[in-house]
A protein has these predicted regions:
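Class I S-adenosyl-L-methionine-dependent methyltransferase catalytic core
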Residues: 1-165
Length: 165
């Protein structure tokens, strides 16, 4: 599989916008920046939200970052930028460890992976739930400051924490 298929998922709705479920966001705490926010969204994921028009890839990233990138080939540059940012925050991706991008940007530089139990039900821009995703999801952290939160989520039964060396 090549990197262009990085987060592609086929559903009855053909879209690469898979908004983070509010219930998950509420468990993750406060974020300063969302560099890939949907233009139309039922809730903000962070204090500052860059949309496609703002092009979060060319903007300065700061503070604790939340990144649920557009799925499909658009996810790859966000993954690269987050790995280079190497600051506090979390990225939500499908768990597709066979993809080259995982071996280029996650395994060599990330500190933690949190494998979410089950499959998420992402949301549409109006806030309604989509069907269950056909792939498992994980949270990726490049900064040690996320450890306590991820450990807490594991104790709550939300998933399993993996510490990368």
């Amino acid at each position: 599989m090549n990197s262009k298929a990085f987060n592609t998922v086929k559903t009855e709705e053909s879209t690469n916008v898979w908004l983070t479920p509010r219930e998950l966001l509420d468990k993750l705490g406060h974020f300063d920046l969302d560099p890939c926010a949907s233009t139309i969204r039922p809730w903000d994921c962070a204090d500052i939200n860059y949309t496609k028009e703002d092009n979060g890839l060319i903007q300065q990233w700061f503070g604790r970052v939340w990144c649920n990138p557009p799925y499909g080939s658009e996810a790859y540059p966000f993954l690269k930028k987050f790995s280079e940012y190497n600051g506090p925050g979390l990225m939500l991706l499908f768990t597709r460890t066979d993809i080259k991008a995982w071996h280029d940007y996650i395994f060599p530089t990330a500190k933690y992976l949190f494998f979410i139990k089950g499959r998420l039900k992402f949301c549409r821009p109006d806030g309604s739930q989509k069907a269950t995703a056909n792939a498992a999801s994980c949270l990726i952290a490049w900064d040690e400051s996320e450890f306590e939160l991820l450990k807490k989520l594991e104790k709550e039964g939300l998933g399993k924490l993996a510490i990368l060396s």
